[in-house]
Amino acid sequence: MQISSSEICELISKKIAKFDIISSMHNEGRVISVSDGIIQIYGLSDVMQGEMLSLPGDKYAIALNLEKNVVGAIVMGEYTHITEGTKIISTGRIFEIPVGSKFLGRVINALGVPIDGKGRIQEEKFLPVEINAPGVIDRQKISEPLQTGYKSIDAMVPIGKGQRELIIGDRQTGKTSLAIDTIINQRNTKIKCIYVAIGQKFSTIVNLVRQLEDNQALNHTIVIVASASESAALQYLVPYSGCSLGEFFRDQGKDALIVYDDLSKHAIAYRQISLLLRRPPGREAFPGDIFYLHARLLERACRVNSNYLKNILGTVNKFSTGSLTALPIIETQDGDVSSFIPTNVISITDGQIFLESNLFNSGIRPAINPGISVSRVGGAAQCQIIRKLSSGIRTSLAQYQELIAFSQFSSELDEITRNQLIHGKKLIEILKQKQYHPMSIAEQAIILFAAENNFLNDVSVEQIIKFEKMLLLFFNTNNSELVLSINNYKRINDVVENQLSDVINAFKLTKCWS
């Protein structure tokens, strides 16, 4: 059977008419080398810094090095399936993480994937892990306190909502415990917490999550993990992912707290990546942009004003604000705060809480050195009652330290000096606090009031801790309305002072602490 040329033309015309061309242009390249989670890609001609690159098997990489003919990228997760010649496709998007309120109470990895075995999390939206910090015009003055529950911090080194306060000290000095207690203290507030674990053992993280559960603090907390067994790429990414989760709450007009534990390991992970990418090393083999690494992360923690929220949410109350408070942790070696990473982060943050091994080993917990611990926000981040009652504590402790040094060279001391030494010892005992026992504003105010108004003069140093315990029990049992009033109004006046004095005098008649 023969087909004429006209029939052939007609068949071809029908086929062409039915043919649906779906064209999609994308930029692709090929892997030319793979080593230690770093891939070198040839052929990607149009790529952004930090862009997400698509790999086979639903995996992704982030472009970090942009050279003339080659792009250097870090693989997020396993890279054993990637070989020379593997096709890489650019996505045109910065790396994003799922965010939402349903992440509260869950443990996730750096990519936002749950690792606690409780099932999938329904995200509300996706946010870039790298985003510019709010500008100066968008920021609100820090004026509201974020209570840690520690007398020594809330009295001497107050932290405000939107502040960046560094926790620094040697290993095993209670840095993580302090941060976890701060999270626990937010259980009765509306503050959402994010704990970022960088380069830690899984056993440590499991114990930490269990402590949060036991203290009813996991429901308002997100734990985001890049453990020591995971790649340097994930350890580098995880604080930025955690920050995006915190910004989600901040930009809804809520208050959030984020703990980075710790940025020393984060810097080491970034150094490893930079050396593998053959970037020129600088001081301590860290790359030249190590300061910018932490600056762009910590600058995202702030308190934003109502105009900023209005641009995001539409209509808001003119007094509405949102905040993200950061508590970065840095581990020092043998108390050396002058090394590269500690000095960098000290210069970025709004103050530091310095924990000393000597104080920790001598039984002073938290082991805060009041001499070099400072909050650059100061009294603006304290409620009125704590600000008034704590005004003389730092001075008294400084005088005590001077007198201790002086008394070592003098065998005879006058009565005034002896009384100052005893008062200083009592203050140190008062500022001691057990782990997982944060205090309310009223409880702190009661103890500080007793110390500042000479109610401890007839209490020996050895009896201080028991005196404090029994005094708080007496208040909570017999004067719960006064305690509730102080917690609600957070102010002190002549009436409150008289009420406190009367109750403490009534308590002292019982002599139940001796």
UniProtKB/Swiss-Prot annotation:
It is an enzyme of class 7 (translocase). GO terms for cellular component: plasma membrane; proton-transporting ATP synthase complex. It catalyses: ATP + H2O + 4 H(+)(in) = ADP + phosphate + 5 H(+)(out). CDD domains: ATP-synt_F1_alpha_C, ATP-synt_F1_alpha_N, F1-ATPase_alpha_CD. It is a peripheral membrane protein. Keywords: ATP synthesis, ATP-binding, Cell membrane, CF(1), Hydrogen ion transport, Ion transport, Membrane, Nucleotide-binding, Translocase, Transport. GO terms for molecular function: ADP binding; ATP binding; proton-transporting ATP synthase activity, rotational mechanism. The record marks 373 as: Required for activity. It comes from the Bacteria. InterPro entries: ATP_synth_asu-like_sf (IPR023366), ATP_synth_asu_C (IPR000793), ATP_synth_asu_C_sf (IPR038376), ATP_synth_F1_a_nt-bd_dom (IPR033732), ATP_synth_F1_asu (IPR005294), ATPase_a/bsu_AS (IPR020003), ATPase_F1/V1/A1_a/bsu_N (IPR004100), ATPase_F1/V1/A1_a/bsu_N_sf (IPR036121). Its main location: membrane. ATP binds at residues 169-176. The keyword Signal does not apply. Its EC number is 7.1.2.2. It is found in: Cell membrane. Pfam families: ATP-synt_ab, ATP-synt_ab_C, ATP-synt_ab_N. F-type ATPases have 2 components, CF(1) - the catalytic core - and CF(0) - the membrane proton channel. CF(1) has five subunits: alpha(3), beta(3), gamma(1), delta(1), epsilon(1). CF(0) has three main subunits: a(1), b(2) and c(9-12). The alpha and beta chains form an alternating ring which encloses part of the gamma chain. CF(1) is attached to CF(0) by a central stalk formed by the gamma and epsilon chains, while a peripheral stalk is formed by the delta and b chains. HAMAP family: ATP_synth_alpha_bact. Belongs to the ATPase alpha/beta chains family. Produces ATP from ADP in the presence of a proton gradient across the membrane. The alpha chain is a regulatory subunit. This is ATP synthase subunit alpha. It comes from Buchnera aphidicola subsp. Baizongia pistaciae (strain Bp). The gene is atpA.
